Each structure stands twice: as C-alpha cells, then as structure tokens.
C-alpha cells in the first residue's frame, strides 16, 4: 500500500514540477464585463452590461470599442450579456429594448468585422415584458448546434405556458 502512495506522490510532484509559467495581465477600463470570447490567439472580445463590445489586443493590451447596431435595454440584470465566436461569426445574447420599459432576451449574429458588427436577430423570446430579471443568456456550441439559456424573467408562469 505504501508503494501506491509513493507513486501517487511522485506523479503529483512530477506534474507540478513541469508546470509551465504564465503571465497575468490586468485588463483595465472595463465596466461590468459579462462575456468574453477569443477571436484569435491574440484578440479577445468582451461584452459590457451597459452595451459596449470591447476588442482587446492581448499583446499590447490595447482596448478598442467595436460599434454595433443592437438595441439594448440595461435594466436590473439585463444588458449586453454573453458573446461567442465561431467560424468568423459572432453570436450575442442581450436584453432587447422593445420600448415602454419592455424587454426580452434576444440572440443575434454578425459576421466578424473588427470595425463594426451588424447584428441580425436569430431568436427573440416572447412576450417582451416589464422586468429586469432572469434573462438567462449563456451561449455554447456543441456538434454544430447553438445552445442558449433563457430565463423566465422573474415570472415563473411564463415558463410553464409555451
């Protein structure tokens, strides 16, 4: 039994002894960052709840705001939420402004353009309501399918009535 412990100890020690060093750089000038996605080995897109999309150049630390056409209502837990890059396409989830303080969770896509992203909605949750809660909004891709979490907006019965 003692030899098993010795092997485990040596394995753990050898793995940690060969661990690579890494460097941590702090990204500043962000306001309530929510989601992030790498678009290359050297570039990262970050969403801010207020509605801004920031392009971060990892080597220089340069931060640039990317213009977009989304109608975002930042209210309570809502705003510009998750972001995902896949094959030159950017997907975002956000609380879409429908006027008169009504909003809903929407998902949009745009072709990658570092200067301006022109989004088109591919999903709009119904109905838009006056609530700043439970938008959900995490995005993931598996086997070429886009998955999204969508909240019940603090109105539990909406989720029970498809």
Q: How does the language model describe each region?
A:
Residues 161-162:
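Short, flexible helix-coil linker/hinge segments at the edges of structured domains or between repeats
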